[in-house]
């Protein structure tokens, strides 16, 4: 499996790993992310606590790539996921990795992720599906795809269920999401560089 994943990754610039997280882990992270976003929204709008708000420490609803989504850099819990996932990801892609940073977003209705490539600190990245609420959508089993333009220029629609992740070459492959129809969708991004790189 590892050699097949590595081959696919090298040929396409990405690879999907199903069931990376167990349900008890992704369910806990999903509740944490929803509660954190809710708490920070209250902190920002409440006259009693708005002076306590710090965008860099508490997160923000202002994200250039996904306007309106709540996002947070370097959450200590997600940094633990970043560190503890490194060896598994290194084994899959056969690259000695060094963690650079974690980032997470809680998307809401009509959010999109603009088409982009990642910055140099994201040579090897993952987007990890934590959970989503699409109970407002009539389409049965609605799943919000991430689009990835593979090395050969072909655009692939990648569906992730909670616990699944896609590992991709963040600086090399364009990726994006169209408008989200559901109520919320939680994703964690784990970013790494080649330990022996430039």
Kindly give the residue locations of the regions a language model identified.
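A structural signal for short, well-ordered beta-strand segments and their strand-loop junctions
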Residues: 16-19, 98-100, 167-168, 189
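A short local loop/turn or secondary-structure capping micro-motif enriched for an aromatic residue
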Residues: 25-26, 123, 176
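Conserved double-stranded beta-helix
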Residues: 62-71, 80-142
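Catalytic core of non-heme Fe(II) oxygenases with the double-stranded beta-helix
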Residues: 109-172, 184-188, 194-198
